[in-house]
UniProtKB/Swiss-Prot annotation:
<dbReference type="InterPro" id="IPR029063">
    <property type="entry name" value="SAM-dependent_MTases_sf"/>
</dbReference>
<comment type="function">
    <text>Specifically methylates the N7 position of guanine in position 527 of 16S rRNA.</text>
</comment>
<dbReference type="GO" id="GO:0005829">
    <property type="term" value="C:cytosol"/>
</dbReference>
<keyword id="KW-0949">S-adenosyl-L-methionine</keyword>
<keyword id="KW-0963">Cytoplasm</keyword>
<feature type="binding site">
    <location>
        <position position="73"/>
    </location>
    <ligand>
        <name>S-adenosyl-L-methionine</name>
    </ligand>
</feature>
<feature type="binding site">
    <location>
        <position position="141"/>
    </location>
    <ligand>
        <name>S-adenosyl-L-methionine</name>
    </ligand>
</feature>
<dbReference type="Pfam" id="PF02527">
    <property type="entry name" value="GidB"/>
</dbReference>
<keyword id="KW-0698">rRNA processing</keyword>
<protein>
    <recommendedName>
        <fullName>Ribosomal RNA small subunit methyltransferase G</fullName>
        <ecNumber>2.1.1.170</ecNumber>
    </recommendedName>
</protein>
<keyword id="KW-0489">Methyltransferase</keyword>
<feature type="binding site">
    <location>
        <position position="78"/>
    </location>
    <ligand>
        <name>S-adenosyl-L-methionine</name>
    </ligand>
</feature>
<dbReference type="GO" id="GO:0070043">
    <property type="term" value="F:rRNA (guanine-N7-)-methyltransferase activity"/>
</dbReference>
<comment type="similarity">
    <text>Belongs to the methyltransferase superfamily. RNA methyltransferase RsmG family.</text>
</comment>
<dbReference type="InterPro" id="IPR003682">
    <property type="entry name" value="rRNA_ssu_MeTfrase_G"/>
</dbReference>
<keyword id="KW-0808">Transferase</keyword>
Length: 211
């Protein structure tokens, strides 16, 4: 899949206004990338496929209706800003919160959100220092191991929270490392951008002994 294919895939699924926001996001990202390492340099020529489309696929996998989306370790805004851009027209009541400890990246996130006219919450702090958010959806992309991701997500979950974690082919081994106190069933969904990648979705997950 090339960049043109990715843009076509997106344009079939979102409004013209949303595409305009994503185009602006792409422009801002490539501009800021010259001074801040927002994405891996090797992916700068494939932003639409590797980052924007890869993030956009999570939007349709989330539980509906969702009112609070928490994106952990947002980095350059993936998937958080993409989700917010897609939600603006179709899910205006969705609050997207982006957590990022790097102050410079937070500066980019705030400026991108401002120019894209997105109302998002940006928390510039370490994940472990974030107060409980009671999220309907929690996402994390290219952040940490699955067991660590679940540890990060636990304070913000309810029994109905949907977890969305993109993973590579190591996901099978990672699933085997889940804490014993978790009673979860993972849905393994093939990524639309990479045949060697999946999205792990957990729905209705809860800690043993909790409601």
């Amino acid at each position: 899949m090339n960049e043109s294919d990715a843009k076509h895939w997106l344009s079939d699924r979102v409004s013209r206004e949303t595409m305009d926001r994503l185009e602006l996001y792409h422009t801002l990202l490539t501009r800021w990338q010259k001074t801040i390492n927002l994405i891996a340099p090797s992916t700068i020529d494939s932003v639409w496929v590797r980052h924007i489309m890869d993030s956009a696929q999570l939007f349709d996998l989330a539980s509906k209706p969702a009112h609070r989306w928490l994106d952990l370790g947002s980095g350059g805004g993936f998937p958080g800003l993409v989700v917010a851009a897609m939600a603006k027209d179709v899910c205006p009541n969705l609050t997207v919160t982006l957590v990022e400890s790097d102050i410079r990246k937070c500066g980019f996130l705030r400026e991108a959100a401002r120019q894209m006219d997105l109302s998002v919450k940006i928390l510039s702090r370490r994940i472990g220092d974030v107060p409980a958010q009671t999220a309907d959806v929690i996402s994390a992309r290219a952040l940490s191991s699955l067991s660590n991701l679940i540890g990060h997500a636990r304070p913000h979950m309810t029994p109905k929270t949907c977890l969305l974690f993109p993973k590579g082919m190591s996901y099978v081994a990672e699933l085997e490392t889940l804490p014993d106190d978790w009673q979860v069933n993972a849905e393994v969904i093939e990524s639309v951008t990479d045949s060697d990648a999946v999205i792990l979705r957990f729905r209705g997950a809860h800690l043993e002994g909790e409601g």
